[in-house]
């Protein structure tokens, strides 16, 4: 079980982040069962009967274990000394619960309502770089560019396309008319949200982690990499 798995780790393991994910059908990212049906049946080739069985079994597991697993994950994050993140919050109520748990940043809030509530609670909003580049969510949720337009986006995640991160930061710089602010979504903002106080900006006494980037049309090409002040690439 999740509780047993978490129990294998301790503060000495250096766990930095615990993310509270719940992919139960019918809520959060998968609140629209028709979209979930198309996704699951298309990816796994399930029949309608198999899909309905999948939904019912996942919902039954959530009913039986969801609350205790969530409580255990929050408690273990505190024991580890890890930063807590929420995941796919959809409603103001879910964000409020995340805030009470002590979440410092929200991974991929799925609605404007959730992002606005994050702002009210002082929770950093993180969205996926692929979402920004493609102009929308592959799951039909809120678009990163729309949250950026409403000043509700703080951090970019590479998500499932690591190479998208730099290009997306430059795109945000263009959208906001502020390149340093765009770059901050992949440097200082995530460093602050995750408690990495020794990095994220160029300042005396901090790590000298630097990349030199050339802009080619809408893409970013890395031309040099320094870690701790030493060139490694």
Regions found by a protein language model. Give the residues of each.
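Generic structural signal for hydrophobic
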Residues: 9-10, 77, 98, 118, ...
């Amino acid at each position: 079980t999740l509780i047993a798995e978490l129990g294998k780790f301790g503060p000495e393991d250096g766990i930095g982040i615990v993310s509270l994910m719940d992919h139960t059908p019918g809520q959060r990212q998968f609140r629209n069962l028709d979209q979930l049906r198309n996704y699951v049946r298309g990816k796994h080739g399930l029949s309608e009967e198999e899909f309905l069985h999948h939904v019912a079994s996942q919902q039954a597991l959530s009913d039986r274990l969801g609350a205790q697993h969530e409580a255990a994950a929050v408690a273990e994050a505190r024991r580890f000394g890890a930063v807590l993140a929420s995941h796919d919050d959809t409603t103001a109520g879910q964000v409020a619960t995340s805030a009470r748990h002590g979440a410092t940043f929200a991974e991929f809030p799925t609605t404007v309502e959730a992002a606005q509530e994050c702002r009210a609670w002082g929770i950093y909003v993180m969205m996926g770089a692929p979402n920004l580049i493609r102009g929308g969510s592959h799951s039909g949720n809120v678009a990163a560019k729309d949250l950026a337009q409403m000043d509700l986006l703080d951090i970019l995640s590479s998500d499932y396309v690591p190479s998208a991160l730099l290009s997306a930061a430059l795109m945000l710089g263009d959208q906001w008319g502020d390149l340093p602010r765009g770059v901050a979504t992949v440097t200082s903002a995530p460093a602050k949200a995750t408690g990495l106080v020794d990095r994220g900006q160029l300042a005396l006494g901090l790590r000298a982690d630097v990349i030199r980037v050339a802009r080619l049309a809408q893409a970013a090409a890395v031309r040099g990499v320094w870690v701790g002040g030493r060139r490694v690439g």
